[in-house]
């Protein structure tokens, strides 16, 4: 994709999931998002494509996870499950049947009427604003003035195997 001029690449690790995915696929196909992110950023940088934006997704739910992803080289973090939870998903795991009782993953008009788009939009807005504020705090704590300045050297691992896998320092 980058060889034909793509502006960005989205890498999706297996840490996320959709309620519509079969369990055997969701749990056993792919590699962890952190590893996929590290490998993708290294490849882009090593092949003169550092200008290509890297978007990562797959299991990122909390601001600390998102900030770490940015420090590992993501230019953006796409959220699915976290956004669904923010708008009211209660994880009934009925997405694949189209019978979501809270009205999110359905085309059934009766079920859809249970979701108030204005309330859901406000909840999502509050979640994203709070997450951004917390990520900005993480950047400041490391001496950075913005999220975009977070870098791999701002991270440390407690486990040597994780440090080696992600090319970060070990602090025990």
Could you describe each region identified by the protein language model?
Residues 88, 116-172:
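C-terminal extensions of enzymes
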